Structure formats: structure tokens, C-alpha cells
Amino acid sequence: MLILNNGQLKQFYQKSQKDKIIAVDTEFHRINTYFPKLCLIQISNLSESIIIDPIDFPIDFKLIEEIIYDEKIKKIFHSASQDIEILFNLFGKVPKNMHDTQICLMPLGYDNSTSYAKACVDFLKIEISKENQFIDWRVRPL
């Protein structure tokens, strides 16, 4: 679901507080810029997934901060370093109670750069399309 207003984001946060777990991914642009420019945030709880478009639909970033930094909610990332970098640049802090599935794969014999697509194939037998992996996330409409 594309989040169009703060009310929708508040409802999602309330559901996430009950679930106590979310998955987070960001899309950004970092060509010819020192700091990455946030273009999209994707968050899923146990019942729904949302897309936050900070370019076309300005949302109260305080609400995003509340979700991402709620220590009672476990955050799941894959290859979190760049997500953490952009979140730190926005909010000046690193999320707590977070897990990086890429790091979790390392004790199982995977290297430190195992892709999300590889993990999905190996563990879930699901092939993930990577056709949009290198698109310019600044371009609208999505």
C-alpha cells in the first residue's frame, strides 16, 4: 500500500507495535552526491507492506522515526549498512533491536555479500526478480 498521508502511517505504526516486528528496506540515489538521497522506504509488518514516497508524498518524518526507532519493535534488514547510513543521516542515530539477515547467513557458510535473492532461492525456493535493482529511484511516477 502506498502511504498517502500521516493517518495511514499512524495506523501502520499501531499495527506494527502489536506485531513487534517489521522488515525495512530503503531505496536511494547516491550518484554524484556525498550523502545518499532517500527516494523510497518499504516497511512490512506481519499483515501488510507499505511504501513511503518522500518525494511525491511528503510524510511527517517524525512518524517514520517513531516506527524505525521503537526499541520494542524488532527491525529486520538485509545488507543493512546503506539503509543504516541513510537513516543515520536523516535522524542522527542507529536503530536498536535490529537484525541483518545477510550477517545471519555468515555462520551458515555464506559470505558477507550474499544477496537477498540468493537467500530466497536457497531457503524458500523463490526466485526474486532483480530487474528494478539498478533503476533511478528518483524518477516519478513510480
Predicted regions and their residues:
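Conserved RNase H-like, two-metal-ion catalytic cores of nucleic-acid enzymes
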Residues: 1-118
